[in-house]
């Protein structure tokens, strides 16, 4: 039941408050005196949004468990920082790479330094769906990201904890986030 509630919360976040409520009202009105199945709920939510809800949710309903999202920072040619985000099935007992994939809504909060004035600023990147094994996310232009803890830069995956996954940060990103938490940034 915990996974179900968490997955519905995640879907609510993807669709937004008003669209989610409208979809639920549509579902309840359509099936108020009838039997319904999961696909009926997905269809009702899709009818009021531009999201293919069935495709998004199928892996969450049919896959056992949930993913671990691994994140690291690399630099492109030219010096632009890029977040590399990858997924695999989470297993507390052992390394598990069985090929399962989820469609994971990825949201990221980045604290970095504005190049124009050197001020520390926080930016939340637009949510993207990680549907493959991995993807690269460019940081916004005009920001300098440093792995030196003294620079007060960090990456926070899943702000608000609305998506259902665990996060494993690279050693460098973990140290930066720890420093940000200690400084209460």
Report the location of each language-model feature.
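Non-catalytic accessory/interaction domains
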Residues: 3-10, 18-22, 29-185
